[in-house]
C-alpha cells in the first residue's frame, strides 16, 4: 500500500493550490484527478478577478489569459441597460477571461514544481477512517489500488463524495444548485471591448445569462437556471437565448459545456478527523 502525508482528490484550481502550498511547506503530497487531462472539459465561464489572483499569489500569464475585463454591462428583467466602467466605479468583476484548460494545467504544474506528485485518470471510489489516517480506495487506469494518507483534502466539486464519505453534509437541495449550459461561440457581436455582460430575467429563471468575451468575436455565452423555477433544461434556455439576444443571433458554437453550480454558499462543516474539503466541494 502506498502512503503519503496528504492526498488531494481533484486537480481543479482549489486542489492544485492546496497541493502546491502543502508541498512548499514540506509535506509529501499526492494530487489525483479522475480525468485523463487536467482542465478539460472546462466547467465555468472562465472569469477570474485580479484581486483573486493576487490573493492566491498567481502572476497573470498571457499564455492563459484570453482577454482583460474592464467593463460590466447589466441588463435588468425590464430591459434597463446599465454600463459600469472601471474608470468610473470600482468593480469586483474587473479581471480576466481565461483559457481554463491552460490555466488549470498551469496551476497543476506549479504544484508539481513545488514537489507534489500527480496521478491522472485516477478515481477515488471509497475511503476508510483509521486512528492515524485514511485509507482511500482508487482506480488508476481501471486498476484498483489503495493509498493511506494522514490527511485527505476533497477538492472534488459540488456534492463532494469525499465530504460525504467523511460524514460531512455536502448534499445540496435542488434550490441550492443551478443547472448551467454554455457555448463557446464565434461571430459574437460585442459592442464594448473588454465588457462582460450579465442578463437577468425570464431568459434564465432563478439565475442569469452571461457573455464573457475571449477575443474580438469570441465569447463564452451561457446561463444558469434553478430547476425549481422552470420546466425547461438549461440547454433549452440557452438555445432560446442565443437565438434572440442581438449579439449572438449570428454566432456559431464551437464548444458546449453543461454542469451544476452550487449557489448556497459555504458549507457549515468543512473539516473532520483527517479530512477537509475545499473549492466547490466546500461551497466556495
Label the predicted regions:
Residues 14, 37, 159:
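Conserved Rossmann-like nucleotide-cofactor binding loop
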Residues 51-106:
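A conserved beta-strand/loop capping segment in the N-terminal third of enzymes
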Residues 259-284:
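FAD-binding beta-loop-beta segment adjacent to the flavin cofactor pocket
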Residues 23-43:
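Glycine-rich FAD pyrophosphate-binding loop
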Residues 1-14:
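Beta1/beta-strand and adjacent pyrophosphate-binding region of the FAD-binding site
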Residues 248-263:
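A glycine-rich dinucleotide-binding beta-alpha-beta segment and adjacent secondary-structure elements
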Residues 43-46, 208, 281-284:
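Glycine-rich phosphate/pyrophosphate-binding beta-alpha loops
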Residues 11, 25, 109-249, 267, ...:
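Predominantly flavin-linked oxidoreductase catalytic cores and closely associated redox partners
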